[in-house]
């Protein structure tokens, strides 16, 4: 259905992730935790994790398994960002489409809907989820991420929109 929007979606994702941090998830670079990086085979200092390695991890662990390439670009980005950052993106998209289908079946169910209605409803569900989480010190960052995603998602375009 959609073209390969991974490079563009990854660039937008990196605008959300930034660089090196240490938080409850441990040492993280480009949104990749040390645990994930080590499982991938990275042995260096986390501060020096190459962005290319983060891109390879993102594609293999979050883009391909969630079949993001099957969805219109604005939906693919929301799905990808949520899979990467945490949440229940497939469950939320199934709820919006009123289906239990996954992969190509879910993409087909969503393809007959207005892309921007799907994006809006998806982000409403994501905000509800984020509001329910503990660690209120991260609330502003989470809300800013959603705001950026809605704005950035508007810059994505493909033939399916």
Where are these regions (language model features)?
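Cell-wall polysaccharide-cleaving catalytic domain and substrate-binding groove, primarily
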Residues: 1-161
